[in-house]
A protein has these predicted regions:
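Phosphate-centric recognition/catalysis
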Residues: 2-23
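General beta-strand structural signal in soluble alpha/beta enzymes
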Residues: 5-6, 21, 43, 127-131, ...
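Conserved active-site and cofactor/substrate-binding residues in soluble primary-metabolism enzymes
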Residues: 5, 38, 61-68, 72, ...
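Short glycine-rich phosphate-binding loop at a beta-alpha junction
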Residues: 85-93
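Conserved mixed alpha/beta catalytic, RNA-binding, or beta-rich assembly cores of soluble enzyme
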Residues: 22-80
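Acidic, glycine-rich active-site loops and adjacent beta-strand->loop/helix elements
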Residues: 11, 47-52, 93-97, 133-135
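Phosphate/ribose-phosphate-bearing ligand recognition and processing surfaces
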Residues: 96-109
Length: 160
């Protein structure tokens, strides 16, 4: 089955035939977590770096934010028997909202990526691969069976 992950959303699957997909990642991040031993995959589409900006919104939807969304995602994997050493984490998105990145006043895409790296560092985890920054949107597809992450951006397709 194909599951579409919306903005500020999370999907996790252990069904080998499933695909997880999210569209139109601009400054948002599409973060995939894959347990290669248990064959489980998760895809988080988050918008903003830090849930301390609005704790009420984060309580209502933790997937809005990198930190609170990652906490829910990782907690689910660990609760279901994953070990941190078995997790493969990749990310795409984090684009600038301006062609000239220096004109992007808020730099949300960059801040999202920094927030993710800080969160992972604090959890003792590392990114395996990333495709972030630049200008333009990305679509991310995650195959549960293989753990492959495909990124479509501006007409090209690549695997992370």
């Amino acid at each position: 089955m194909v599951y579409t992950v919306g903005v500020a959303d999370l999907k996790i699957s252990g069904e080998s035939s499933d695909l997880l997909i999210t569209y139109a990642l601009g400054s948002c991040l599409g973060i995939t977590v894959y347990d290669f031993k248990l064959k489980r995959a998760g895809l988080l589409h988050c918008m903003l770096p830090d849930s301390s900006i609005d704790k009420d919104k984060a309580a209502g939807n933790p997937f809005l934010y990198v930190d609170s969304g990652m906490k829910v995602l990782l907690d689910d994997f660990l609760r279901k028997g994953s070990r941190k050493n078995d997790l493969i984490i990749r990310v795409a998105g984090g684009s600038s909202s301006k062609l000239n990145e220096e004109e992007d006043f808020f730099k949300i895409g960059r801040r999202n990526f920094v927030s993710l790296r800080q969160y992972l560092w604090n959890e003792g985890l590392m990114l395996k691969a990333y495709d972030v920054g630049g200008y333009g949107s990305r679509t991310v597809t995650m195959a549960v069976e293989s753990g492959k992450m495909l990124i479509k951006s501006q007409g090209s397709l690549k695997q992370l």
